[in-house]
């Protein structure tokens, strides 16, 4: 009899939780989509000829403890200041120096939100893509903050992400997702549906236009040196695309990246630098193919357990045609959000750290690993 009771208890201990799990799965309204086949390009990933796979070996840390998750950075050459937005709402200014110990961090303006993308307007103003507020204009050396726009076509921005400024003053920016907020970022990725938009704001007419919609987490953006097109990143698709401004058409700029792109910067010297918060992971590749796995992951994420691990972050350098030139990464590195080449240094913002990373490209260059 005790044996029978023990066997029955064992069966119940397995069946009951299983039935409960099935019921919870069925009742959960999260409905991930089948991801387009061009997302499955990991096997076709081609690495550039030059590689530095020990990024952290030469990395220096700027503003340790004074910069609370500095996601994006923008360099103002005339003042030798880096502007960066932090998770506590502060746009901070960092005086850069040859020695990281001589760098000075200043609390400049608090937006009352979460500043992400940062760029400079044609009149010296600072343009901020604030994830909670919308597109902001900070002028008068920080004395005036103005909301430029927070909606388009009657749809409020949920995740104002990155911004770039054309020579004629027009602002181009991304709303990564009109459905999910920054804190729900993983749910946007897991659902596998295109909620992102590419937009423009004309300061003269005050008109906000939707240039493209149905993008997969529209992230970083920059304008080409000849001002003819934009380059924007779609993170889960591992690609960056061109949008021709006058022709209003799109084509792939670079794809099959070795990681998931965040921000992109032009260095003024014929190259773009693409930040990769994480390298390609096997778990994510498998999840992309099977919506039910993404639903399970999302259900777990709602209880505060994030299974979307980020690892082997880095920076990819490409030429004006999108051809990979050099790849700087490290298996121990994660959450690189942006990168800006300033002189001989590469400066990187982060999605998780309390500092800006700096790498001396002359001392720690990418090298030909095939030699």
Swiss-Prot record:
Pfam families: SSL_N, Str_synth. Residues 1-25 form the signal peptide. Its main location: other. It is found in: Vacuole. The keyword Amino-acid biosynthesis does not apply. The modification Phosphotyrosine is found at residue 303. GO terms for biological process: response to ethylene; response to fungus; response to jasmonic acid; response to salicylic acid; response to virus; response to wounding. One of its GO terms (cellular component) is vacuole. Glycans are attached at residues 101, 137, 285. Belongs to the strictosidine synthase family. This is Protein STRICTOSIDINE SYNTHASE-LIKE 7. It comes from Arabidopsis thaliana (Mouse-ear cress). The lineage of its organism: Eukaryota, Viridiplantae, Streptophyta, Embryophyta, Tracheophyta.
